[in-house]
């Protein structure tokens, strides 16, 4: 239901009561505007987190900058790959463009609450079909956006902008972590191929000596078959490691936005090593850096904006409007062939018949806001749990690496002793092959554990939300 109060110029001249009407209308509008200047309530976020981590990184070492955490690995080739991925990854570029698109629209979120002016010109005919008129007019209307309507629109634009920024940041965090993972998978797989190649040479020598032992009737029953089966298993392991390296190189090429792997990557056969480090971030830092939490915060803002808009729709909608109409009689069948009529006044749209529907929408949006708050709380708890899990994994990998380093050193010393015994004639070359194989296996286990530790490190800073500050394109709308 809408009403409009207009005051033609001729009417104002003939009626002395107009000032009282104007004063009364002004008082009514003033009171409505004062009541309508209510803010949109945004609830406090349930952002309670522990003061410190229950798990801590083992040892004290270099302080890690969360914005450049991968540089702790001190691998120049990895640094170059990360820089290339940040500049050329297709998912990240899509997220950046979507953010720019949202920012362009967010600057116009309050456009409908600004004065609008329109002009029109048309030809009309009177009801008797006698005279034809030319009408020209200018109309202006201003939706005041009372009762939180304008603020809800601005809050919604802020939520959309925050959502797009969090999605862009999430893409960047994921891309960097995936580049580190793919690079690590590639280098570990190719290092394993080298070790398996040496193991294959040992197996081949064992099969040769097994044939000699068989001719001399020195072999045990089924010895040669076991040697051949071992050599076949090594060939299968080499094929699997080569497949893993190929998969990692293709994944890395996709992350960089390349058509295919670079042949130079075949030289990546030394996995990066992680030295002792110190985690500087505390649980409260997750609230500012973890994209999933920022996404949940944007959802809360969006839900609050929708609730505020629903509440505003339950109140009268007040607009100020005015128009000037000029009419010219084209047929000149009237005594006066032209006239003008200015008018100004408020528009009041009062919800009557659909007020129940609007109230139901408000109640529904209130429930949606409660759900968004629960989602935010879950995002906070999930972030803390992921960081704690990554810290626990790092601690377990540290313990495992220490044990494997002892085993690797013991196996290496055993190879040295065995070679010495062969030189002294106290043992045979065939007996020393098993020792060499055990040493290669221990080395492979150590490389795998060191790679798993780097993966846990990458998972830690992925959970923290570690990524460089994104470069804002020049001229990007803020």
Task: Describe each region flagged by the PLM.
Residues 2-7, 22-87, 242-288, 330, ...:
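Terminal intrinsically disordered/low-complexity segments used for targeting and assembly
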Residues 68, 76-77, 81, 103, ...:
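Small/polar-residue-enriched beta-strand and adjacent coil segments characteristic
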Residues 150, 166-282, 393, 417-420, ...:
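Periplasmic alpha-helical coiled-coil/stalk elements that build and connect Gram-negative outer-membrane
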Residues 214-219, 422-426, 463-467:
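A short glycine-centered flexible hinge/capping loop motif at secondary-structure junctions
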Residues 217-220, 383, 390, 425-429:
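Alpha-helical heptad-repeat coiled-coil segments that mediate oligomerization/polymerization in large
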Residues 222, 426-448:
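Short terminal targeting/anchoring segments
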């Amino acid at each position: 239901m809408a009403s409009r109060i207009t005051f033609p110029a001729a009417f104002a001249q003939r009626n002395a009561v107009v000032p009282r009407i104007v004063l009364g209308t002004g008082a009514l509008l003033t009171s409505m505007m004062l009541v309508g200047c209510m803010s949109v309530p945004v609830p406090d976020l349930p952002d309670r987190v522990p003061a410190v981590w229950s798990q801590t990184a083992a040892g004290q070492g270099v302080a890690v900058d969360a914005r450049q955490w991968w540089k702790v690995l001190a691998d120049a080739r990895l640094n170059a790959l990360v820089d290339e991925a940040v500049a050329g990854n297709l998912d990240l570029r899509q997220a950046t463009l979507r953010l720019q698109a949202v920012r362009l629209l967010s600057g116009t979120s309050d456009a409908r609450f600004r004065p609008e002016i329109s002009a029109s010109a048309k030809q009309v005919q009177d009801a008797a079909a006698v005279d034809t008129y030319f009408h020209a007019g200018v109309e202006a209307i201003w939706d005041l956006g009372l009762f939180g309507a304008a603020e809800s629109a601005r809050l919604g634009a802020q939520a959309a902008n925050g959502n797009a920024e969090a999605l862009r940041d999430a893409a960047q965090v994921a891309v960097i972590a995936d580049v580190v993972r793919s690079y690590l998978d590639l280098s570990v797989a190719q290092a394993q191929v080298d070790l398996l190649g040496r193991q294959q040479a040992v197996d081949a020598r064992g099969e040769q000596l097994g044939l000699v032992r068989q001719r001399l009737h020195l072999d045990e029953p089924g010895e040669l078959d076991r040697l051949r089966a071992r050599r076949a298993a090594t060939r299968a392991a080499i094929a699997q490691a080569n497949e893993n390296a190929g998969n990692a190189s293709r994944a890395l090429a996709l992350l960089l936005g390349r058509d295919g792997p670079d042949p130079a990557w075949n030289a990546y056969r030394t996995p990066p090593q992680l030295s002792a480090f110190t985690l500087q971030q505390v649980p409260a830092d997750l609230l500012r850096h973890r994209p999933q939490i920022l996404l949940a915060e944007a959802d809360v803002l969006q839900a609050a904006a929708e609730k505020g808009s629903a509440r505003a729709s339950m109140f009268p909608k007040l607009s100020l409007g005015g128009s000037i109409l000029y009419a010219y009689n084209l047929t000149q069948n009237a005594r006066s062939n032209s006239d003008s009529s200015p008018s100004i006044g408020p528009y009041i749209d009062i919800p009557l018949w659909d007020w129940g529907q609007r109230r139901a929408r408000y109640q529904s949006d209130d429930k949606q806001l409660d759900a968004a708050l629960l989602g935010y709380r879950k995002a906070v708890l999930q972030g803390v749990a992921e960081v704690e899990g990554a810290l626990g994994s790092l601690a377990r990998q540290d313990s495992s690496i220490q044990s494997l380093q002892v085993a690797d050193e013991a196996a290496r010393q055993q190879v040295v002793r065995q070679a010495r015994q062969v030189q002294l004639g106290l043992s045979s070359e065939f007996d020393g092959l098993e020792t060499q194989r055990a040493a290669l296996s221990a080395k492979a286990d150590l490389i795998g554990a060191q790679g798993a530790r780097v993966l846990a490190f990458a998972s830690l800073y992925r959970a923290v939300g570690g990524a460089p500050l994104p470069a804002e394109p020049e001229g990007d709308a803020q």
